Amino acid sequence: MGVQGFQDYIEKHCPSAVVPVELQKLARGSLVGGGRQRPPQTPLRLLVDADNCLHRLYGGFYTDWVSGGQWNHMLGYLAALAKACFGGNIELFVFFNGALEKARLHEWVKRQGNERQTAQQIVSHVQNKGTPPPKVWFLPPVCMAHCIRLALIRFHVKVAQSIEDHHQEVIGFCRENGFHGLVAYDSDYALCNIPYYFSAHALKLSRNGKSLTTSQYLMHEVAKQLDLNPNRFPIFAALLGNHILPDEDLASFHWSLLGPEHPLASLKVRAHQLVLPPCDVVIKAVADYVRNIQDTSDLDAIAKDVFQHSQSRTDDKVIRFKRAIGYYSATSKPMSFHPPHYLAARPGPFGMPGMVPPHVPPQMLNIPQTSLQAKPVAPQVPSPGGAPGQGPYPYSLSEPAPLTLDTSGKNLTEQNSYSNIPHEGKHTPLYERSSPINPAQSGSPNHVDSAYFPGSSTSSSSDNDEGSGGATNHISGNKIGWEKTGSHSEPQARGDPGDQTKAEGSSTASSGSQLAEGKGSQMGTVQPIPCLLSMPTRNHMDITTPPLPPVAPEVLRVAEHRHKKGLMYPYIFHVLTKGEIKIAVSIEDEANKDLPPAALLYRPVRQYVYGVLFSLAESRKKTERLAFRKNRLPPEFSPVIIKEWAAYKGKSPQTPELVEALAFREWTCPNLKRLWLGKAVEDKNRRMRAFLACMRSDTPAMLNPANVPTHLMVLCCVLRYMVQWPGARILRRQELDAFLAQALSPKLYEPDQLQELKIENLDPRGIQLSALFMSGVDMALFANDACGQPIPWEHCCPWMYFDGKLFQSKLLKASREKTPLIDLCDGQADQAAKVEKMRQSVLEGLSFSRQSHTLPFPPPPALPFYPASAYPRHFGPVPPSQGRGRGFAGVCGFGGPYGETVATGPYRAFRVAAASGHCGAFSGSDSSRTSKSQGGVQPIPSQGGKLEIAGTVVGHWAGSRRGRGGRGPFPLQVVSVGGPARGRPRGVISTPVIRTFGRGGRYYGRGYKNQAAIQGRPPYAASAEEVAKELKSKSGESKSSAMSSDGSLAENGVMAEEKPAPQMNGSTGDARAPSHSESALNNDSKTCNTNPHLNALSTDSACRREAALEAAVLNKEE
């Protein structure tokens, strides 16, 4: 466990260092200044690391978390917490982890592996016992961090997000902004010089909402029990093992400290496996070693002694050892000045209001200053958004890489052990300091550097400098060639070139596993403790990708500002600056073949969001126009590749998946600058259309509040997306009704009633459906922020439309003897009518047919730059070969499970084509490719077919037997060549039905003269007369019904009008084929904010109910 086990060591072996405290008492200052009860004029300011505190902010280990989360209960808890802090004169500032942190990637990989095992244990427990799992298996519900962030913003609690190195930014932000203490649970904070360190795991709010308690860690007590001076903590942390120098690289050193006579020494020679000593044993042994170091400034001598047993990559380990010391030295160094906005009148330790620093400096406590001093601050590294230090808060973290120890050991006053520190100078708890300390022992603590300005503080990145350099590349747009040894967007443009090749050097998998890199000459032949996982991260985990397209500087500035303020989904900044994201594990049954992994299910959403973020459609359209004007062929567009780190069935998190960004084919999405910063009504329309297109829900009914209330738009979009999955059926009829019924139930806003609701037997499938749905909500938040937030964040929050426990109860009721819809709505006819309307809106324009074969996995796309082995298989839209296919990936495999659906005209054609086997992940124009992609031979229609040439029948063939599943016979299949239909493609069988679910990235429309006529005809007809009758009936239906149309099944799955699509961006040079689909916003002249369909965002009755919920929760705690 390395340094991460130090926090648990404090809890178990240093009970005197863990003191319970009541935060309201600290805020009142009852024991400050000789015990005088003088109310402070400034609140007690606490910084909370949300990364360690999510389960406490959620409300604790309630058993409902396994069902997808009870978000209204969480909302009530946070409302009570905000009220308690406001009434108790406490100011909370919650800091979320928004950093990619490639330097800690190996820690994330290990954590994902453990959580994946926990998810399987949870599923097995629910399947066997039908009860909630124990709280020790707590796995945060999907999207929990973002829901907590939105809820805190709602209750006016200040939030922020880290951008590069979460731990360093939290420490720096705490010191620079005058916080009294830090609420967290991480060993990195315990080993840094934090003024007052409180436990995030022990944070509890009483039932009456008036007492907020936690525990304070007294690090001077920890140092006393270890008999180690705190100024040696940086070396101590570096030798325990950390994200820079992992404990696997220190295994030989740790075993050598124990010696051959130790009772555990026999464990180290077990069959050439990497066995690490127990964490508590290592901590004591390393503390003894560090205490006996004579000269802490001679790092070379220390490193030589530490790695004397190492037989491979010793020089690299020494470098990383020095970097680790520099990292912890920088975070442990106290600030020499404090921001002036903090220096306000507050009762000080002298019994009178005065100017006091946020924490008592070590000089005031007679604690000798640390000898691990940093050199002058390194040159500033430009931030991605512009000038250094600008943003919602300044950073002044020094660069740890070049740090060395301050030698001057002759006048060094430190002592090796803790016992030599004067007793009167040792740290005392905040609430126990009742007597003044002699101020003459230190310099003036109230002196403020006059040259200090918060906006111009130094800004440098953390130990991992990838983000800033990558952003600089994107701003400049330089066409720097990407190399095999560099990162995709970071070609030698970093402050520390060593970081590029070392990749923050760390191991990446659990002990005992075997990797190819662990074999060969680097391992040696007789190494007693093989360091199997000591290769640098980038060499065996990362994959080099081409540089990202340039992004406008103003867009990056806006992205950085919103990211730091906690106002934007963190994936967006990661994609724009680094081109990669990390996807967390959710509760999934890996033995269940019916439900796909969430990472694969919503990958098409992310692909289109990537295309929106990099403005693929507009940039490629401009390039094509320029080539057309110059009478040249359109250039070959290089793909935009995003790396996705994820762990699911059949996929290890140790290597990323390369995913291509896609652009919409139906319309040209404007560039990101216009989406985010445009003020025109047309821009607002485009934001909404881009979001709906990403979610495959670009239908008029989605914007009609009579069918879909605006606060339920995200719910309906996610459900519609799940229904359209081209693989096995995800949602059944009763499951879809259960989702809709619980969203309209009055119980959704009554968390007290839901707490009393009893679930007889948890449904394992319901738990997985909840996880899949919340994963879709997570991606909807991502898409909404990327498209410029067309839906206000207040209407995206899941407490408006989902409760896991309520969904479980509705699902059990719906699955039991096929309960009628009116009973599912508790006998409320109006609710049942609303559910019916919402279901029709979700299924609008979709036609379902039962498939004959299970959909196979499509092969990976043949992209340039990479070997085929670098692409793991994945679902989602796969780019067909250039200029070949007119195949589709339709919504098939359901057999009409959602009620009666109208399938006329092209929908009849689609239904017949799907029933006859022309349904798969994709299909090409040639039969061999089609059969290969569908995993089997196409079935022959039962009534046979005939071949016509120039209108004359020249051949017949017999049919096959009736297919399984009770389906009727297929209509007679006709293949016409030449004749009246001359000019269309050969054979009606290959009618280009436009795909519903996805489109390849480099697949561009090729118009032809009679495209509309072909798409309007059924692919199977007995004669030309049937075709004419079909067209006539089609045209009549299009006039009589607003929801039916003559066009093809457009890519968004909507009924279409047979007329050319209007020019979306006012351009006339688009040479693509006319679109025949009716979009929800197919004309920019349609207003978005003046339209009553969209103006209803602020007038929903659900909003008033949600406001009443907040008042009820606040009043309940009084």
Curated annotation (Swiss-Prot):
Annotated membrane topology is: Peripheral membrane protein
Q: Where is the composition biased (Basic and acidic residues)?
A: 481-502, 1026-1037
Q: How is it modified after translation?
A: Arg-982 is dimethylated, probably to asymmetric dimethylarginine. Phosphorylated on tyrosine by SRC family protein kinases upon oxidative stress, for instance following UV irradiation.
Expression by tissue, per the entry, reads: Widely expressed. In gastric mucosa, detected in the bottom region of the foveolar epithelium (at protein level).
Q: Which Gene3D superfamilies match?
A: 5'-nuclease
Which regions are flagged for Polar residues bias?
A: 405-420, 435-447, 503-514, 924-936, 1076-1101
Query: Which positions carry Phosphoserine?
Result: S960, S1023, S1044, S1045, S1048
Report if keyword Acetylation is assigned. yes
Q: Where in the cell is it found?
A: Cytoplasm; Cell membrane
Q: Which SUPFAM superfamilies match?
A: PIN domain-like (SSF88723)
PTM sites of type N6-acetyllysine: K932
- For the modification Phosphothreonine, which residues carry it? T655
Q: Which GO molecular function entries does the Swiss-Prot or TrEMBL record give? A: RNA binding
User: What segments bear the compositional bias annotation Low complexity?
Assistant: 376-396, 1038-1051
Keyword annotations for this protein, in alphabetical order, are:
Acetylation, Cell membrane, Cytoplasm, Membrane, Methylation, Phosphoprotein, RNA-binding, Tumor suppressor
Name a single GO cellular component.
Answer: nucleus
User: InterPro entries per the record?
Assistant: Coact_PPARg (IPR026784), PIN-like_dom_sf (IPR029060)
Question: Which segments carry the region annotation Disordered?
Answer: 374-533, 921-945, 1025-1102
Give the residue ranges for region: Interaction with YES1, SRC and FYN: 339-405
Region feature (RNA binding): 829-1118
Q: How does it assemble?
A: Interacts with PURA. Interacts with SRC family protein kinases YES1, SRC and FYN. Upon tyrosine phosphorylation, interacts with PIK3R1. Interacts with IGF2BP1/IMP-1 in an RNA-dependent manner.
Clinical disorder:
May play a role in the progression of scirrhous-type gastric cancer by supporting cancer cell survival during oxidative stress.
PANTHER family according to UniProt: CONSTITUTIVE COACTIVATOR OF PEROXISOME PROLIFERATOR-ACTIVATED RECEPTOR GAMMA, CONSTITUTIVE COACTIVATOR OF PPAR-GAMMA-LIKE PROTEIN 1
The UniProt entry's sequence similarity note says: Belongs to the constitutive coactivator of PPAR-gamma family.
Q: What is the role of this chain?
A: Component of the oxidative stress-induced survival signaling. May regulate the activation of SRC family protein kinases. May act as a scaffolding protein enabling SRC family protein kinases to phosphorylate and activate PI3-kinase. Binds IGF2 RNA and promotes the production of IGF2 protein.
UniProt protein name: Constitutive coactivator of PPAR-gamma-like protein 1
